[in-house]
Amino acid sequence: MFSSTYFRLQEAIGNGLPGTQENTHRDFRNPLQTFDSCLILNGRERISSSKTLIINYNLYLCTIIRRKNNFKRHTMKKTALITGITGQDGSYLAELLLEKGYDVHGTIRRSSVDFRERIAHLEGRPHFHLHYADLSDSMSILGVIGKVRPDEIYNLAAQSHVQVSFDSPEFTADVDAVGVLRILEAVRQLGMAATCRIYQASTSELYGKVEEVPQNENTPFHPYSPYAVAKQYGFWIVREYREAYNMYCCSGILFNHESERRGETFVTRKITLAAARIKQGKQDKLYLGNLSSLRDWGYAKDYVECMWLILQQDKPEDFVIATGVQHSVREFCYHAFKRVGIELEFTGEGMEEKGIDKATGNVLIEVSPDFYRPTDVVNLWGDPTKAKAKLGWNPNSTSFEELVNLMVDSDMAKVASDGAAEKVRTNLEEYLEKGIVK
């Protein structure tokens, strides 16, 4: 007997008698057939997004049609593959998917340096797995996708530093542009185009020399760095595969998103770490670039939820992921130092601008020409209207000040911990030198 919440039996004919085909249903005798976008194994064991219908009923001919408005993708345990799992977004996304019951697989590169700090607490869990792969190597990508055969792929791996892209444009293009193609083509070559959904992490840097404020899904791109140009290729190749091969693949155009796990080379983390170090007497001054640069900053933990939602829809679409609120680098500095009890006032303009401790008169922030980009994007401001309306996503779950405070509090604890560890090391060295400890 056939039974399904998502399908109903239209007709069953025994002994292999010829069936009929009408506009509303089909009769199949072949045990392997295509039907809409669903996969059925033995009529009952598994239902998921696919273009394959498999029915094993021996001599019986069955016709099954999908119930209208009743098909959901959350009917079975799913498997996700995350590239860039050791990064800020990858680690938060892994946590989210594990909470939702996924089997989570992540790719890491072979390196002499261990970058697993953000996911160390996940290793050892039964549904968390790591694989060696590199976006610059087609065979490693093909191998891991073929081994895991995921329902969803989240491509978060990238060379994501704008300044580095000027120094290493070829490497940036190989990873951020061709790397995306390698994933798409691997999925297609493995025959998974109908069963695997792909999320591509795109960037607000695509808008570059902005022609419209705020920026939405229809705003023209004007990339202003090798990084942005590479990401633009990634965006368009995803759309091309979606249209040419009917693949469920889409891009999330991510505006700046930060967290306690942000890399220390990014401007927001440089600010919060410097505020903590200056407060604890470990640093004298912070050097930055253009303090007037405007950014739309959100919380990474909120943004990975939007990534997941993008892959749960009936049809693939691209979305802007942003808060819809702008702040300057200067504002970020002000709130970060305020959190540690230092009130800043700013004097001067451009290269001459300085951030001064109002209480002591000490200059704590200066502008350095070393941090000015050859071409600087100054007015990125995202419009998340589509994501809010179609995905039901709330981009303002965490406010700007809450985000800054989370980051500063984390760095205050880190600096204090590092200081305590350094003190222990210093004392141990002294004891060893004096022969107190052997």
Give, region by region, the residue ranges found by the protein language model.
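N-terminal Rossmann-like NAD(P)+-binding domain of SDR-like oxidoreductases, especially those catalyzing
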Residues: 57-63, 68-257, 301, 307, ...
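Low-complexity, intrinsically disordered or signal/transmembrane-proximal segments
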Residues: 6, 10, 21, 25, ...
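Polybasic, lysine-rich low-complexity intrinsically disordered segments
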Residues: 22-23, 30, 34, 47, ...
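C-terminal substrate-binding subdomain of Rossmann-fold SDR/epimerase-dehydratase oxidoreductases
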Residues: 12, 99, 106-107, 133, ...
